[in-house]
Amino acid sequence: MWIHFPVRNYIHLSHTILHYPCPDNAGHVCGHRNVSRNGLKDGLGVGVVSGGVDRTVYDRDTYPHPIKESDEDLGGGGVGSRERVGPVGGDHCHG
């Protein structure tokens, strides 16, 4: 199964490497990161899940920083904390 993006990058469900665009240099591949076989994420806030439940939410205002919800948030009771997970690009970007 192939999923095509306007920036000419791709995700293939059999790959464990995810290619994503540089936020400052659209159309160029910024780098890659290892992802698990249980779920793949792209830098555009679209989730591709091959098993289990997708629990990652992307904050589009601060792209490409994903925000992960804690398990308490998913239980439906009370307000849980949100953990910001690192920049995906940063120093590794190249043109």
Swiss-Prot record:
Annotated protein name in UniProt: Putative uncharacterized protein 068R
Compositionally biased tracts (Basic and acidic residues): 57-69, 81-95
Region: Disordered, residue numbers: 57-95
Organism of origin: Frog virus 3 (isolate Goorha) (FV-3)
